[in-house]
Every structure is written in C-alpha cells, then in structure tokens.
Amino acid sequence: MSSLETPPSPRRRARWKRVDILPANIRLAEAELAFAGRIGRENLLKKALLSVSGEYDYVLIDCPPSLGLLTVNALNAANGLLIPVQVEYYALAGLALIRQTAELVRDLNPDLAILGLVLTFFDARKTLNKDVAAALADEWGDTLFSTRIRDNVSLAEAPSNGQDVFSYKRSCYGAKDYAAFAAEFLERTEGCYGTRG
C-alpha cells in the first residue's frame, strides 16, 4: 500500500448489522516506508477517513504496539484513545509512553482525548494482576473502565479458528466480558461524537 487514498482491500460486511471491517494485510508494512517521504504524511489516514465519515458512528483503529508513523496517523485521525492494558507491571511503563505520545500528537490533533483504559488478560486469582489493577485505578481514576477482560483461552482459540469470540464460543467469559465492555464504552461515549443512533 503506497497511500491511504485507496484502501488496501474492500470493506467487508461483518456478521453484525452496521459493522464493516477493513482488515490489515501484509501490504500495510509497506505503508510506513511509503509515508516517510510524503508531505503531510501524518494526515493521510485522517483524509482517507473523511470520505466515509458520514457512514459510521464509530471507527475503531487498532494500532501496532509501536509509536511509528502508522500510529501517529491513527492518533491524528482519532477523536479518542482507548487503551487496552495487559495487567502486568511492564504495561505501567508503556502507559507513560502512550500518555506522552498522546500529548505530542495533540499538537496535530487538539481534540484527541483519552477515553479510557480497559484491563485485559485479567485473572483475579493473581496477586500481581490485582496489584497492577489497583495501581492503575489510583493513577487513572474514572478513566479506567470498570469492566475487566478476563484471561480466557477462548479468546486465543477463536482467531486461530478464523472466528470472532462470539461466533466461536458465545458463552465464554471472554465473550461476556467484551459484550459488557462494549456496553460500558457505548454508555460512556454516547452523544460525544454525534452518533446517528
């Protein structure tokens, strides 16, 4: 993919009403190199999303765990930042870097807000998980979503079987947790971005 003016693959209708997916592919790796020499490179995704902005209530952009040009494009195009946090101590250091990056990107996108943090791979039986969750609650307060995505083998098995967790095993903890999180997320963001309902 040499630019974002034309998406790398067609949007696919998901099994849910009003949900489309534009999956990444191997060509996305070329994008970072292609962006490097472009004038206005940090605005490419923002411009591409403008062409479909009236079609969606939400656009979720999954970023790589790096702070390169793809992530800067995503943060510049976004209204809000949702941060999934694996409940381990190294994640605390990573959060400081994410917060710093969000502050830097606000020079390009002053509307970028941290919508919240959601804890993932949570196991209430592990003291470390409880300690990290408590430290995050102390530091981030209400920014931390109350729903926790519990560690669940079905979350790992579903994609390896080519399915989302709801199709794979709707009754598992992972599916229930993500459904609860989606409801909490929608409640928190309702009316914030001019959604069509």
Model-derived features: positions:
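P-loop NTP-binding core
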Residues: 1-197
